[in-house]
Amino acid sequence: MGKPTGFIEFQRLAEANEPAESRLKHYREFIITLDDEQASQQGARCMDCGIPFCNSGCPVNNIIPDWNDLVYRGNWEQALAVLHSTNNFPDFTGRICPAPCEAACTLNINTDPVGIKSIEHAIIDKGWEKGWVLPQPPKVKTGKTVAVVGSGPAGLAAAQQLARVGHSVVVFEKSDRVGGLLRYGIPDFKLEKSHLDRRIAQMEVEGVEFRVNQEIGGESEHSIAAERLLAEFDALILAGGAEMPRDLPVPGRDLEGVHFAMEFLPQQNKVNAGDQVPAQIKATGKRVVVIGGGDTGSDCVGTSNRHGALSVTQFELMPQPPETENKSLTWPYWPLKMRTSSSHEEGCVRDFAVSTKKLIGKNGKVKALRLVRVEWQNGSMSEVAGSEVEIPADLVLLAMGFVAPVKQGLLEELALELDARGNVKATTDGDGCYATSVAKVFAAGDMRRGQSLVVWAIREGRQCAREVDAFLMGSSDLPR
């Protein structure tokens, strides 16, 4: 700890954003990274905690106090090494992680927490700028082969870890580009795809092979039988995510103009990449309604505003959370409180405790929603009598989360055992971690745990890689 009084001398300084009126004209990132002096001061705010709760609050267990102190002292290259020791892709988490570490920061008990995420962002950006982020190809090859199905954060983390210890790794991706959720689920204004592309290039030098347009299981023209992978590879990691969206089973669901968020968002990313997207779903000049109050819903809001929507309204079934948390009750855990994203700041009407009763159409196209107020008591929901109302809508986007992995194809072909929620069953404790019910098949990320954060997917990919390495070699030196 380099500055014992840093948390007293320096106030928390958040990263700045480009003004909304200008950033709405493009799809680039708009966050302004801290400069060296600002990052040093923010690192100085890190206290000499007896127990660094930030470390346990972070799913990948980043050694946060160490790299905060190193940034304060100006030792950026060593800070990057410490950061990379626990996280393969701080370029992603430094941009899109909600930072549960900051909720767990000891300062957060009675003041503003350390700006951990902004410091992480500054470290990795400086690392690339200075040329410190280099491939780490293995010195010796093991002769073992691993297939990774899915190129999202869990699959990429597992593939990189295994390649670095000498295994031959092939990543299979059903889409036309590598990246999974990072590529097509997260808007470019939150994560420009150049960050993803340079990581993929790094991994290719390390020996990872990527095969796109290849779906494992199923009957499409690009599909490959799951049994073929079992025959050709020594181990198989399933990291295909939880792609089955939660639907809205109400009258009018089949009207034109009603779409899942993951039909809407990927199209814009494809357009940004230079692709031609026939019949793109556009919000231009439309009254947009987003159903679902989470991050994906927020991404729909930001994208709709960039399209030039006439209006954007977001509905959430749950009641409005409090503006601030009771820290004496919630710390060091992630608190339930009102969160306003940059997309909300760009223009959006938000309403809570609202349920959709019916989608109303005209000539086969959605024109309105019939809504009702709901009350919550002891975890149960009831409608408020006489509260029904209709609001106009030309485009309805369903962003209510994801319920499970897709069963058809890969999971059915392998006849994998599922847990009670419909995810691939695989424990993270004891012997046989991440192993499924089928020999030499492992699962990690959202496909195993259900919908979650990118940082959790990275954690699971890293841990799964260690278990696969131990399975192949008898033991593993990879970190847990």
Describe each region flagged by the PLM.
Residues T145-V170, T296-R306:
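N-terminal Rossmann-like FAD-binding beta1-loop-alpha1 element of flavoenzymes
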Residues D254-G285, Q377-Q451:
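FAD-site-proximal beta/loop scaffold in flavoenzymes
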